Structures are given as structure tokens and as C-alpha cells.
Amino acid sequence: MKPWAAFHLIFLVASSLEGEVSNYGTGGTQDTEPTCRTEHQCTRDKIILQSQPGIPGIPGVPGTNGSEGLKGDPGPQGPPGIRGPDGIRGEAGPKGDKGDQGDKGDKGDKGDKGEDCNLDGCLPTEVRNCQDLLEHGEILNGWYTIYPTKENPMVVFCDMETDGGGWLVFQRRQDGSVDFYLDWESYKKGFGKQESEFWLGNDKIHLLTSSGTQQLRIDLEDFEGSRTFAKYSSFSIGDENEKYRLIVGSYLDGSMNDSFRIHNGHSFSTKDRDNDTNKGNCAMMYKGAWWYFHCHHANLNGLYYKGKHANYADGINWRSGKGYYYSYKYADMKIRPQQSETTVS
């Protein structure tokens, strides 16, 4: 059926029914009951019949997108992932401050006895002096460790060349680089430089000369290169309580006359400890430290002058040598255990 034919059919039926309703309404008072018995919409005075669906229309134009919705709440935390590989180790940080010193630990067990010494330069504690070193094959001048007693190791200079070697040097002057006009405590402990001038120390000299007889040799050299020496049969000094009192034996021989034995029996004096027999302080008058009496014939710890000097007797003087107005360029004093035979040089 054509769409327009259906339209006309509906229109005719509707018009017919409307006429009936109107006639009944004018001819009596009986209510009008609907005559529709379909599931479609109806009223008391109209019946609308639905025809077949028409052809769908053309789709409309799509609408515009709506605005972005609000961000949702975070979801629940997921389970931990697997551990990743170790990263590259970073650079070391700066060194921290030194911590407090820890408590002292317990004393360890006593170690096993060591093996016998077989290394070069390894010397037994029986090496008491430079002569012992020479007998152990040490033939070079230099500083060595000796053991006058096992409890008292000592570093000393050994002259291994002069007069057969084995001499222990306890005093040396050679260039004026060290001040010898010092006090009692300095001479007690020792001072100076290993490579140049030094005084070994009265306490050490006492220890070295307190057992066995030690010969003494004094060597001098002037600024013209002339060398002289004097040798004595024995030499020792007392301890500090004895004021380091000098005990020197007989003059044996030498290329210069004796100017030292006259000091025998006298105490050691310094500028701050006057132990001489003079009314004044000989150490202060003659700018040294020595076994002064009233005052001296030798002053090997005096001021370092270069040869002749104007001041009286305050240089490195030797009365029977160059006298009181000439100071020597080089001086040393050294000891060696007494020997039955000695070689003079």
C-alpha cells in the first residue's frame, strides 16, 4: 500500500467515527463507551491507528565533543616490583675527621724468639762501641747504633779511618753552624747536627766511659790545612752529681803539645752553672763550656772564629798550639777502648 493511501484510510475512518459520536450525543443521554479494543492509544472520542514504520531519516550531524572530565582518584598501590640490578658504585666521599682514641687493648702474648741475624747491617746487642763495630766488619765512617748496655742503645758517630779506626766521636767543630755557647741542660742531653757539629751529651759520655778504660784522642786542623793531634792514656767523666768531673790520664804522644791534662780533676761549667775555681764565671768570660779551673789552657767549645781573632781566649783555642788568639777550623774529641798496641798517625 502506498503511504498516501494509508493516510486517506485513516482519515476516512476517523471522520466516520466522529459522526457517530456526534449523533449519539444529540439523540440521548447514554454515555459513549469507547469502541477501541486494541493495545494502541485511544481516547473516548478518537481512535489513532498506527501504520507501518516509515523509512528512517538521514543521520544527523555528530555533536561536538564534551569537555574533559575531572581527574579520577588514585587507585590502590600495586604490589612491589622485583628488585632491580645493583647500581654503579659511587665515588668515595671525603675523609672524615679523626675519631677519638680507643681504649688501650690488652697486652698480647709474648712472641716466639726470633731467628739469628743473618742480614747485612744486622748487628748483635753485644756491639758496645765503635771498636766492636770495626771487628764486625764495619769499616766506613758514619752513624751507628751501639749498646753500651742492653737497655741503653745509643746512636754515635764512628771514625773508622783515623789511627786504626774504632774511635767514637763525642765532640766535633767544623763550620760554625751550631751554637756551642749553651746552658747546662743542653750539654747534659747533647745537641747539634749529625752532618756537621755536635756534642754527644755529658750523660752519654759518662755512660760510655764508666766501664773499661777509654783512650782519648784530640784532632785539630787550622785554616791553612795543617793537622795536629794529641793522645791520652785514659779519659772518663763523673755523673751529674759529680758535676761531670774530668779524669784524664797521661799524655801518650801527638804532633802538638799537651794543653789538656791541666784540666784534670775539675768540674764541668756552663754559663748558667759556675763550677770553676775562678772568682768569676769562666764559661761566661770565654764564651764556652768546659772543665775550667781558673780558667783554661784549652777551650774547644768556644766561639767559632776563622783563624786569628782579637778577643782573648774565647775561640777554639789550644794554648800550646796556636795560642789564645787563634781559633781552629776543625776540632774533634774521640774515645776508643784501650789497646795493648796502638798505631800513631
Swiss-Prot record:
Keywords: Complement system impairing toxin, Disulfide bond, Hemostasis impairing toxin, Hydroxylation, Secreted, Signal, Toxin
Residue stretches making up the Collagen-like domain: 57-114
Alphabetical GO biological process terms: complement activation, lectin pathway
Domain Fibrinogen C-terminal, chain residue ranges per copy: 121-339
Localization of this protein: Secreted
Region (Disordered): 48-118
UniProt xrefs under SMART domains: FBG
CDD domains, per the entry: FReD (cd00087)
Keyword check for Chloroplast: no
Coiled-coil region(s): none
Gene Ontology CC terms: extracellular space
UniProt key word Phosphoprotein: no
Homology family: Belongs to the ficolin lectin family. Veficolin subfamily.
Job of this protein: Initiates complement activation and/or interferes in platelet aggregation and/or blood coagulation.
NCBIfam families according to UniProt: GGGWT_bact
Name used for this protein in its record: Ryncolin-1
Organism, as annotated: Cerberus rynchops
